[in-house]
A protein has these predicted regions:
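An active-site-proximal structural segment forming one wall of the substrate-binding cleft
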Residues: 17-24, 49-88, 112-121, 150-156, ...
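Aromatic-rich peripheral "rim/lid" segments of glycoside hydrolase catalytic domains that contact
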Residues: 12, 74-77, 81, 87-112, ...
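Active-site-proximal loop/turn and secondary-structure-junction residues that shape catalytic pockets
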Residues: 34-36, 90-94, 136-140, 168-172, ...
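Aromatic- and acidic-residue-enriched carbohydrate-binding clefts of CAZyme catalytic domains
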Residues: 41-57, 96-105
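Distinct, well-ordered alpha-helical segments
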Residues: 98-101, 118, 141-157, 176-184
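Hydrophobic faces of well-ordered beta-strands that scaffold small-molecule active sites
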Residues: 28-32, 84-88, 132-134, 162-166, ...
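Aromatic-lined carbohydrate-binding surfaces of glycoside hydrolases
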Residues: 4, 28-47, 90-96
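Short, small-residue-biased leader/transition segments that mark boundaries at the very start
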Residues: 1-7
């Protein structure tokens, strides 16, 4: 069936990535189990056929559990210890602070109960030291931030979620580092010093081609990391990871997404370290 073919293809992709990580002593964040985007439309329909109606909530729950079980079991049995965290649910909240009702997951369930189910199944099948995150973008904007806080708090209080994944797709003007700091402090209130906070998809969009102009990007990176280091060292906020959304500017998703060449990362398309790289190192000292 279409479903079993997809599982097989996914295993092939997973195997390549997990082997690369394992061979090189690298750890992976798993991204992402439940998302409105890039989940095939047929996954939500009867007989996996888009011409048929959406399945019932009970059938959807069974499919979700089967899928999460398969993915986590495959990773853990074949490459134990490589995946240290999962973004269990990605982008469940709208910018205005409401839940994303346009998601097929929401449509089938009729409510946001799919979020709790996803975390319940992830907790059930994940090894005990694997951390589970709710991940989202514009996570520093007040209305959205406050809803993410509430969703994560409810999950965390049930023992289902370990932390907040802050995607951290920034531009040169937005957000301010102060706004990011306020969001981190807000999320920390869920369980001060214990709840994990990670920046999961960090990049800073800009179109500055020259090394001289790139210095302003480096300055923003340095301000950000100074704040993160201070939050962790001096305020004892449990910031446990920063993941950049790509290695070099040449591989960044942003150029395609923005329709203009972006230079958002720590290394240039030529793999040379940029001033932003040294700025991050300086902040870590």
């Amino acid at each position: 069936s279409a479903a079993s073919d997809v599982y097989k293809r996914q295993e092939e992709i997973l195997q390549k990535v997990l082997k690369l990580a394992s061979d090189n002593g690298l750890k992976l964040r798993g991204h992402t189990l439940v998302w409105h985007s890039q989940t095939p439309e047929w996954f939500f329909h009867k007989d996996y056929n888009v011409d048929k109606s959406l399945v019932s909530k009970d059938v959807m729950r069974q499919r979700m559990e089967s899928y999460i079980k398969k993915v986590l079991t495959y990773c853990q049995e074949n490459y134990p210890g490589v995946v240290y965290a999962w973004d269990v649910v990605n982008e469940a909240v709208n910018d205005d602070g409401t839940m994303r009702t346009s998601s097929n997951w929401y449509k089938v369930y009729g409510d946001a109960g799919y979020v709790t189910d996803a975390f319940t199944f992830a907790r059930k099948y994940a090894d005990k030291d694997v951390k589970l995150f709710l991940n989202d973008y514009n996570e520093y904007a007040a209305a959205k931030r406050d809803r993410i806080y509430q969703v994560v708090k409810d999950l965390y209080d049930k023992g289902l979620c370990d932390g907040v994944g802050m995607q951290s797709h920034y531009s040169m003007t937005s957000p301010t580092i102060a706004a990011v700091k306020v969001a981190i402090q807000k999320y920390n209130q869920i369980d001060p010093g214990k709840i994990e906070i990670q920046l999961t998809e960090l990049d800073i969009h800009n179109t500055f081609r020259t090394a001289a102009d790139q210095k302003s990007v480096a300055t923003k990176y340095q301000s950000l990391f100074n704040m993160l280091v201070d939050s962790r060292r001096n305020q004892k906020i449990n910031i446990t990871g920063v993941t950049f959304w790509g290695l070099t500017d040449g591989d960044s998703w942003l150029s395609d997404f923005k329709g203009e060449t972006s230079y958002p990362l720590l290394f240039g398309a030529d793999y040379a370290a940029k001033s932003a790289y040294f700025a991050v190192l300086n902040a870590a000292k």
